[in-house]
Amino acid sequence: MRPVFLIFLLLTTASAQEGVTPSKSERVTDLTDTRIKESSGIARSLRHDGIFWTHNDSGGEPCVFAIDLQGRTRAKVRLREAVNFDWEDMTSGLDEQGAPCLFVGDIGDNLFIRRSVQVYRILEPNIAPAGQPAAETISPQPQVWHVSYPNGSQNAESLLIHPKTGRIHILTKSNEGKSALYGFPAALTQKKGEPLILEKITDITFTGEERTGKRHVDDRMCTGAAFAPDGRHLVAATYSSLYEWTLPEGQTLAEALAKKPARLIPELVRQLEAVCYGADSRTLWITSEHLPTPLIRITRD
């Protein structure tokens, strides 16, 4: 049996270290598939319990991988006619008919040179039974949205979908910690050759607090984000921390995100790259680009 490594994290507000609340984190498994070299996004399956989807970073194959809680690959799906220019995040959600789908964000732009970025959507694929080889399959033609920012090129590593409204969001990444949340427009019909223009919702600043006694990691750059399935929380990852906001009913996203978030610090995790919620809207799952790639579960009292 694979050992479960217990580590601990601290939960603090963004303004104080007092009232520290310990929480438990488990390194559930390491991914065994050597083809997953830089896990850059993670999404909870909406069809299969205990299954997550991930993908490689820029320049990798345009493929998504289904992984289970033993670290085994249960599917490898190549997105038809897709290109991995800089895939940075993925999420799960429903299409207009209520069918479970995977959304992949080719949204990275370190050099700020892309006129538009892409978001792909496919129906969530089948997976192989446990213990059977996961042969590569090719998806049907994906839905592809080409999107641009209203204020010029931006770099981003966070793709998230609000579970109640179905609206797709992108949270940008900044070396200075000055991120911004954008949403897709209400009308998703595109004219040929013209990208959709994203709508800016609010700015979010990550201050980059240092972790005492730890190797310095820049904590200002946002590397992943997700909405909770119940729509009541939003979590954003930096290289070494997680920040979680409560989203009260009756408040806009901009109003809720203007408040100080709770800060979670997963110990022994290097280069935190992706985060998603479990089905209970409280458990958090994270991966890292560090090899071997860990799958870590964070639970709170």
Predicted regions and their residues:
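Sec-dependent N-terminal signal peptides
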Residues: 3-12
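Positively charged n-region of N-terminal signal peptides that target proteins for export
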Residues: 1-4, 42
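Sequence/structural signature of beta-propeller domains
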Residues: 17-301
